[in-house]
Amino acid sequence: MSRAISLHSVSKTYGRSSRAVDRFSLSVAPGEFVVLLGPSGCGKSTVLRMIAGLEEVSEGELLLDGEPSNDLSPRERGMAMVFQNFALYPNMTNRANIGFPLKLENPRRDHTDRVESTARMLGIESVLDRYPRQLSGGERQRVAMGRAISRRPSAFLMDEPLSNLDAKLRNHLRAEIAQLTAELGVTTVYVTHDQAEAMSLGDRVAVMRGGVLQQVSTPREVYALPENVFVAAFIGTPRINLLQAVVHAPLEGRMSIDLGRQRLPLPEPLSADHQLLRIQQGRPIIVGLRSEAVRIAPRSQARPGEVALSGIVEHVEYQGHEALVHLNTGSRPAVVPDLESARPQAPQRRRARSGGTGVLERLKQRATGSVAVLDHPAEESYAVRSPDRPAVTASDLVVRTGPDMRLRTGGQVPLLVDLAHLYVFDHSGRRICPLPRDIPGLDV
C-alpha cells in the first residue's frame, strides 16, 4: 500500500549552528512522484534521509499516513532506498542481492517466485545468476531497484540513482523509472540536481536552496511561474536572461523599463501585470527573459505585444538543431549567488574572529537572505579594456535561433522581445509578474 508522507516545519541541525535543513514543509500524497531538486549541498539528500529514518529530525514533525513517525526505526517505516552507488553485495549473485531483504524478513520462506517476477519486470532475468561485477552500470542499477521493489515497500526513496551513468543510459532508465513507478503506484520521493530528470519524472517538483524550500509546483508551473529569481535561473536551458532594470512610470507618457542603454516600452493599454509595476517606479528590479521570448528580426516584422531592441553578436553556439546567440545589449546582468560567481574582486584579509562574521553565519545569511544580487558596476564594466588589445564586451542576452541563420561576430542585429513572456522580480528576487492567470494554458 502506498504511503502518505508529510513533513511539517522540519529542520536538521548539526552541532550548535550548522543548519542543513531549515523549516521544511512538504506533503506527498499516496502514489505521488515528488522530486527534490537543487544544487549540491542544498539539503535535499538530508530531507530524504530524515524521511527514511537514517537521520534524526532536529525540529518539526514527520507524519506517515497521518501518524507521528519521528521516532520510528527505518525498518518500521517500510520504505526502500535506491542510492547512486548501487550498494550491492559483491560476493552475492544478483538473484541473492534482490532476494536479500526478503530473506531477512522471512529466512525460511522460498522467495524465488517474487525475485524472478521482479527481475522480469526490470528485464534482468537473464543476469540473475551473475555477480554485480559482471554487469554494466545500467544493469547494476536495475538490480539495485529490483532489491527495493521486491520488498513491496510503502514508498521509494531514490537518492540520485542515475548520476553515475552516462547520458544515454540515464535517459533510458529515466523512462523506465517513470513507467515502473506509475505501474506500481508507489509513493516516490526522488532526489536530483538534474533539472531534466526533475521535469520529466515528477508529478511535482520541490526546489531547494540552502536548506530552505523555495517552491513546490508541477513541472510546468515551476518553469512558467517561478516564485523567485533562483527558481527561474535554476530551471530552464539555456538559463533565463536576468537583467538589472528600473521602471519609469510618468504620469503622462508611455511606461517603460530602463535596461541601461535601451528601454522596453510597455504596450498600451497596460495589462494588469504591467499596471502593478507602477508601484516599482524608480526602484531597482530584475527583468527575466527566457531565450524563446526574444527573436532576431527587424521591427517591421513585430507581432502584437513585441517591442524592439538591438544587440551586438558576441558569440554563437551551434547546437545542430538550433543555435544559441550570445548578445550584448548594454544591460547589466543580475547575479544569482548560488549558481554563479559575481565579478572577481580583490582578495580581502581575514577578519579577526571577535569582530568578523563566521563562515557558518555567512552561510546562514546566504540561505535565508535574498536570492539575487544587484551589483552596480562602473560604466567601464561594459567593456574590459587592455592597453594592447581592443575592448572586449560581455554578453548579457542569449537568444535561440535556427541553425541556418548567418550572423557575424561583432555585428549588430535587431531584436524583438515578446512582452507576454516578460518576468519581473523585485530587488530581493521575488516575482512581481506575471500573475498566474496570464500564463496561457496554465491552471493554478
Residue ranges of model-derived segments:
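ATP-binding/catalytic-site motifs of ATP-hydrolyzing domains
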Residues: E61, E67, V212
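The feature captures the beta-strand-to-loop junction immediately N-terminal to the Walker
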Residues: L37-P39
